Design a protein with these regions (language model features):
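S-adenosyl-L-methionine
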Residues: 1-18, 27-28, 32-35, 44-46, ...
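Small-residue (GG/TT-enriched) beta-loop-alpha framework at ligand/catalytic clefts
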Residues: 25, 38, 59, 63
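Intrinsic disorder/low-complexity segments
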Residues: 38-40, 54, 76, 88
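A subset of signal/propeptide-processing and intrinsically disordered low-complexity segments
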Residues: 41, 63-65, 147
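Flexible inter-domain linker/hinge segments
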Residues: 48-54, 59-66, 71, 75-76
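Glycine-rich, aromatic-lined ligand/substrate-binding cores of catalytic
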Residues: 82-92, 97
Length: 300
């Protein structure tokens, strides 16, 4: 039995606690009284926080965690940023550079890719720096899912093949494309974002992410694949207009100027508005899908 007097003034706590005890002994309910079976805390990442979990979250944490499904988030390399990190448009010769994923600005599912790291002679020079750290080297070029470990909202992105992941831009290397799509959809869902914030702060380190439970998804796998591919198509289309992005395809070439520039811009704005509306619908559909799989009310 937990009686919440956290927000009560210190001089009033004793009296409030006595009132709550008498209320509980009479068999009456109060919103400051929380009753839970402590044995159910065994499924939680930290039993102390179990008192703050509602019934929906207790049920969610009965599902297998990512690590129990052999899906593991991993910490990556640490470089000396001013020395080794570059964006591709800063370089005139790419011979000594490899792609890296250092995290991203907030962007669900997909982001722009522009970052490189100096890896001359297979990192011989980079490794001489005291601040350099090599971690999970055998996974460094594997595709999967990447995410920035900092922030209140956990947003994940496609981690492309042959990209380094880092201590800031961490990764879930995936064994196949379908596994990557499923992880991408789940981690970007409101369910996963809410659940992980129950037991972490702003640093979503790989060990904490590995404890995140995932509902069984087999019955909705085809929907998951459809949603994630549709979202990626939309984002790639508009990110290809960003000239700082490696996937830049040219702005003028994609404007289809049949009459005037103003008309072409108006048409592009209409397409952007329509695509953004569709994107929001797909994100909501993904949220609802995972809430349904967890048997939690969509509007809770």
């Amino acid at each position: 039995v937990f009686m919440d007097v956290q927000d009560v003034n210190p001089e009033e706590k004793n009296e409030n606690l006595q009132v709550l005890i008498r209320t509980y002994n009479r068999g009456e309910d109060a919103k400051w009284i929380y009753v839970a079976k402590s044995v159910e805390f065994d499924n939680l990442p930290n039993t102390v926080i179990g008192y703050y979990f509602g019934e929906d979250m207790f049920r969610l944490f009965k599902f297998s965690s990512l690590v129990d499904r052999d899906i593991r988030a991993r910490h990556g390399f640490s470089f000396v940023a001013p020395v080794h990190n570059r964006t591709y448009f800063e370089c005139t010769n790419y011979k000594n550079y490899v792609h890296q994923y250092p995290g991203s600005f907030h962007s669900l599912f997909y982001t722009v890719y522009r970052d490189l790291v100096d890896w001359k002679n297979e990192g011989t020079i980079a490794k001489t720096w005291n601040a350099f750290r090599s971690c999970n080297e055998s996974y460094r070029y594997n595709p999967g899912v990447g995410y920035g470990k900092r922030g209140d909202i956990l947003d994940a992105h496609v981690l492309k093949k042959n990209f380094f992941f880092t201590n800031e831009g961490q990764a879930i290397p995936c064994s196949n494309e379908v596994e990557g799509e499923i992880c991408l959809c789940y981690i970007n869902s409101i369910l996963a974002q809410y659940a992980i914030n129950l037991y972490t702060g702003q640093h979503k380190i790989n060990g904490n992410l590995n404890l995140l439970p995932m509902p069984d998804y087999d019955t909705r796998q085809s929907d998951i694949e459809r949603i994630v591919n549709a979202i990626i198509d939309i984002k790639r289309k508009w990110f290809s207009l960003d000239e700082t992005n490696l996937e830049y395809h040219g702005l003028i070439a994609q404007m289809h100027i049949d009459t005037t520039i103003d008309a072409a811009l108006n048409k592009m704005q209409e397409q952007l508005t329509a695509d953004y509306t569709r994107y929001e619908e797909l994100v909501k559909e993904n949220d609802d899908l995972w809430m349904d799989l967890a048997d939690i009310d969509r509007d809770s």
